[in-house]
């Protein structure tokens, strides 16, 4: 398998193609495009930019299917670190991981079938159906996960050469890399331990209702025990609102808060934070976690 440069699809024999080029629909501008062939699959990497920001679209294509995940630009370095972990660790040291980025959660799950080992990467968010790509480990040290990692490294490096207009630096602490069961630590990042109540992983995310349209793209997600809470700014024919969605397993419920009540809501939440701060000091969220292996 080889890596190449260009714009469009992959060439025979596993070539990866690089180039800046068109192809972005609407207001999206394509900055970098690469293609990688792993076994019978083609993977397309497209770094794009629009007025809402920059993102990396990774698509997996086989003869019968195509699936896509969308990675925020702030998550490219985390994907690179995670693939480094899977490439460089011994097989018995590999664990499934979970990465939280803004309003999205990405799951990295190790599996094996008759063709060999693979890494399943799934994207889940409150505004998009769950999507999954499956990356074979490869039959030699420079194939599969390693080739995928190398392309992520090239895109990460190239991304730094493009200056985004009105670029806003992510707030400190928005992405953290930790393990919550000890094993599978990824070198080069903090090893802060989250509370034990965060060990269980919920994996089903429902899509929002059709009546809640006009989402602005300003979203956040937090974790508490076995639940996730999604905060999404949006608007409809009644005006602007903040939708707060609670997701636990397959259960999902939402409340819609008009912006006119947001300040009062903030004051009430602040009141309860103040009177309970002695109880919640030291509780921190985890953006990348090790997932307990299934019982066999």
Curated annotation (Swiss-Prot):
Lineage: Eukaryota, Viridiplantae, Streptophyta, Embryophyta, Tracheophyta
Source organism per UniProt: Arabidopsis thaliana (Mouse-ear cress)
PTM sites of type N-acetylmethionine: 1
Modified residues (Phosphoserine): 207
Subcellular location: Nucleus
One of the record's GO molecular function terms: mRNA binding
Residue span of region Disordered: 1-25, 186-214
Family listed: Belongs to the PUR DNA-binding protein family.
A Pfam family hit: PurA
Protein name: Transcription factor Pur-alpha 1
InterPro entries assigned to the protein according to its UniProt record, in alphabetical order: PUR-bd_fam (IPR006628)
Gene Ontology CC terms: cytoplasm; nucleus; peroxisome
Subunit and partners: Homodimer. Interacts with TCP20.
UniProt keyword list: Acetylation, DNA-binding, Nucleus, Phosphoprotein, Transcription, Transcription regulation
Major place of residence: nucleus
Function according to Swiss-Prot or TrEMBL: Transcription factor that specifically binds the purine-rich double-stranded telomeric repeated sequence 5'-AAACCCTAA-3' found in promoter telo boxes.
UniProt keyword Transcription, yes or no: yes
Gene: PURA1
